[in-house]
Regions:
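FAD-binding core/adjacent interface of flavoenzyme oxidoreductases
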Residues: 1-5, 63-146
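Beta1-alpha1 glycine-rich phosphate/pyrophosphate-binding loop at the start
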Residues: 2-73, 160-185
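Residue-level detector of alpha-helix initiation sites
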Residues: 11, 36, 108-110, 130, ...
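A Rossmann-like FAD-binding core segment of flavoenzymes
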Residues: 26-28, 74-91, 97, 164-203
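Glycine/Thr-rich phosphate-binding loops of Rossmann-like dinucleotide-binding domains
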Residues: 112-113, 155-156, 179
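Short, conserved glycine- and acidic-residue-centered signature motifs
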Residues: 125-128, 154, 183
Length: 203
């Protein structure tokens, strides 16, 4: 039986598996994910899930039953340590997965800032569920938060934090927020909108 191994349990990895089944592939499909949750939608991380208005299971693409019905095997909390393309094996800490076809769908990782106290408990990167869960432990009204980055995600987080009663400052390296993706007029609109909500924006 032909075996497809998908490394990455995000949007691309999950939809690769779904598409294979939809197109009639009847071989074995294995997804390896280093996260502890079924593949999920990430946009709510900076919105409803951040505001604790959405349960984790509501963000999942599909239920666990769906993967079982479609015979898609998912290995969560699993990190690939090495891949042998000669023998077609992917090696984890305690297992080995052979494959006929290998799909890399690992997505992106946030750029870590070179700074002192980089492991501080009040420094967060927003990329996955566990990041937001860590933030939930620190978020309380009237605290001050500094967001580095005035892109769409930064603005979404700022809006959520204002709703939660925090004092928010955005630091943007460019001359204006959203500079890389919008016109000056649109940037000014969002600048004014968030400023009126109480967000301090420094470019």
């Amino acid at each position: 039986m032909t075996k497809v191994l998908i490394v990455g349990g995000g949007h691309a990895g999950a939809n690769t598996a779904f598409a294979l089944r939809k197109d009639g592939f009847d071989g074995e499909i294995i997804i390896i994910s280093d996260e502890g949750y079924l593949p999920y939608h990430r946009p709510p991380l900076s919105k409803d899930f951040l505001k604790q208005n959405l349960a984790i299971e509501k963000m999942s693409f599909k239920s666990a039953d769906f993967y079982e019905e479609q015979k898609i095997s998912i290995n969560l909390d699993t990190q690939i340590n090495s891949i042998d393309l000669t023998s077609n094996h992917a090696i984890t800490e305690d297992a080995s997965f052979n494959f006929d076809y290998l799909v890399f769908a690992t997505g992106a990782s946030p750029r870590l800032l070179p700074m002192e106290n980089a492991d501080s408990k009040n420094l967060f990167y927003l990329r996955q569920i566990t990041d937001v869960l860590s933030m939930h432990q620190q978020i309380t009204p009237h605290k001050e938060i500094v967001l580095i980055g005035g892109g769409y995600i930064g603005l979404e987080v700022a809006s959520a934090m204002i709703e939660l009663g925090l004092k928010v400052t955005i630091l943007e390296a460019e001359e204006r927020i959203l500079q890389r993706v919008t016109s000056p007029e649109v940037s000014q609109f969002y600048n004014d909108f968030h400023s009126k909500k109480g967000v301090r924006i420094i470019c």
